[in-house]
Amino acid sequence: MDSIFCSIFHMGENWLYFPILVDLYLLLCKNTGREMKKQAASNRVLVQPERGKSMYDYILPVSNKDIISIAKRAFNLVDPRLMGHGERVANIMFQMMKAEGGYTPVQMRNLLTLAVLHDIGAYKTDEIDHMVEFETKHVWNHSIYGYLFLDYFSLFKELSKVVLFHHSSWKQLENMDDVSEPVKKAAQMLQLADRLDIYFENPKNRMGREPFLTYLERERDRKFSSEVIDLLLDTPLVPPSCDYIGISPQFDRIMETVPFTEEEKESILQMLIYAIDFRSPHTVTHTITTSVISSELAILLCGQKHAVNDVMCGAMLHDLGKIGIPVEILEYPGKLSPQAMNVMRNHVNLTEYILGDSVSDAVKNIALRHHEKLDGSGYPRGLRAADLNVPQRIVAIADIVSALTGTRSYKGAYSKNRTLGVLTGMAEQGLLDSGIVGLLVERYDEIMDSVREKTGPLLEKYQEMQDRYWEILYQLEEKEGEP
C-alpha cells in the first residue's frame, strides 16, 4: 500500500483519487488486525533518518545569495524606516574591512552576514523610533534579543556579542575584560556603519558631509575608537562622495566565495522564523508544530525524501510574512475588525515577497497556499480543489491543528476531541481533504507525541532567553550608569 501512496503523491493527474485511497487504507488497517498495525508501524522504520540525524532534518536548496536575500527582504518589512538598512550597513562594513585588509573570505562572509542580521531583535515600534534617531541611548532591547537569537539558534555564536555591543560606546567597551579585542573592534565597526547609514538616510543630511566629520572628531575615543574612525575615513564612503548606497559587486562575490553549509543555512532560517514566532508567547511553537505535523503526515503517506523535504521546507517558511504584520494585530485579544483581518491576511502576500525567486515553485506554493480551501473560500487567491495538490493540503491542515491546539491571545488551547471535531467538520463541509484528515484522526496521538517531543526543548529555550534578557539588561544598565 505504501507504493500506492508514493505513486499518488507524485502523479498530479491522479490526485483526485487520493481521499478514496486514504479511506481505503484506514479501512484495511482497521480490518486486518494486529498484523496490519504492526506492518503500518514498521513502515515508519523504512523512512527513519540515518543514525544521529533528526527525523525533521531538511535541506533548503538555496545558495548563499538566496538565503541572504530572503533575510534582507524579511527585515525590509519590520519597519519602513529600516528598509535596506541591514544591506547598506553590511556594505559599509565591507568597505571598512577592505580598507584594513587581512580578513579571510570566511571572516568577511560571517561579519557581512552578521551586519545584514544585526537588527533581528528589532520589532517594537517604540524602540525603532529610537533606533532611527541619530544620537540615542535607548536601544538595548533589540541588541540583547539579537544577541540571544544568534547565541541560541545560529552557528555564529562567537560573533553574537558583536550584536550585543553594537550600541555600546568605546569608553564602555575598552574596559570590558570579558570581551575579546576582535569582538570589540567588530562591534565598533558595526556601530559606526549603523550610525553612518542612519545619518545619511535622513534627507536633511544627504549633502552634509562636514557635520558628520565634526561629529566623528567630537566622539573620537569616546563613542568610537580612533582605529575604526580612521578605517572609515580610509574608505570612499565619507570623503569625497558619501556614496554608500550602491552595493559593490565585490560584496556579492565575497558572499558566494565560501558557501554556507546546510547547517549554517538552516540556522539563519531558524533565526528568522523564531524572531517572528517569539514576538508573542502564544506563537513560540507555531511554526515548529506545523512543520512536525506536516512532516509526520508526509512520512506516513510517502517516504520519498525529496517529497517530505518539500513539505517540511514549505511548512517552515509558511508564516515568514508575519514579520511585517503589526504586533497589536497579531496579539489582538478578540475578533479582528474586517480592516485588521485584511492586514493579517496580507501576511501570505508578504511571504511571497520575502521568498521571491529564492526557493523552488513547489516549496513556495506549499508555503503560500496554507490558507486556501478546497471549495474556493480560502485566501489569498480563492483556489479550489483542482488547484491544490497533496503537499499543499497537508500543510493547510497542519497549520489549522497548530492554531487549534495552541493558545492564542483570544483563546485557550483546544482539547483533542474539540480539535478533531473542528477538522472533521471542515472536511465534511468540503473545506479540507477528508482523506488526510482521516489519517490525522487515526494517528493523532502518535503525531502529537512527536510535536511535544520537538517543541519541549524550544519552549525551554524561549523561557531561558526571557530570563537571560532581563539579567543582561540589568547588567548593561548598571554598566551604563557607571562613571
Each language-model region and where it sits:
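Ala/Thr-enriched low-complexity intrinsically disordered regions
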Residues: 32, 40-41
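Histidine- and acidic-residue-rich, metal-dependent catalytic cores
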Residues: 52, 56-483
